Amino acid sequence: MSNDIYKMRNLVEISSMVAESSDFFMIKDKIIEKMLEVVHPTKACVNLFYKNNYKHAYLVCSQTLEKIPYLFPIGGTVGVKIDFSTYPKYIHEAVKEKKIVYVKNVFEDIRAIDEREMAKSEGYVGRIVFPLIVNNIVVGFMTCFLVEEDTISDYDIDFISSVASLIALSIEITTKNNNMQRLVHKLRGAISSINEATKKLYHNKNINEFLDHLSEQACDITNS
């Protein structure tokens, strides 16, 4: 089987993972593993921004950390928090301009001057950044690391870009699912509270207190 067919097969498998899961954090490492089966950067990692806050990025991929994936409850942040200002300029460029940036040699590109010590320590030479975009907003980025022996073609970059789009879709699905679960939780709480208020209305006959309580519940559900 040719490498191109392997790529298409793995892309279909990644698409199926995304379609069948409502939790990106449960499948993120499997996605990266499938991607690296058919393209050969040394490793890849995913960083996320939470609530459109670009002051910090959260490293969430155990492929890079070589640790068990972190799983947090709804509403919690996932991953290792890193000051985004410490990232190389070309990563800021990729995020700001919403474009793929390929630095073939970090020791020759002035934009990578601040990461050269890390590159020596980790043993990589090149790096490619793929922004993760949801509804025209960058919600994170994936980076691929290359050593001197690694080769990567334009077709490989297109393939990784397709995977990045599927990762972004998975993040969007997860966000919508979490928002729905939060709303269900609020509705359940509101129903319980309204039932209690109804009992008080029956006993106290105080309609104003009851209406005030309904207003409070409506504000809580709508975040107003």
Q: Model-predicted segments: where are they?
A:
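Heptad-repeat alpha-helical coiled-coil signal-transmission segments
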Residues: 1, 8, 167, 173, ...
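Short regulatory/linker helices and ligand/cofactor-binding micro-motifs at input modules
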Residues: 8-26, 30, 34, 191-209, ...
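GAF sensory/regulatory domain recognition
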Residues: 33-36, 45-82, 216-219
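Regulatory sensory and allosteric helical modules in signal-transduction proteins
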Residues: 67-110, 114
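A short, aliphatic-rich beta-strand micro-motif
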Residues: 125-133
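Short beta-strand-to-loop transition segments that serve as allosteric relay/switch motifs
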Residues: 140-151
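Allosteric cytosolic regulatory segments
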Residues: 157, 161-172
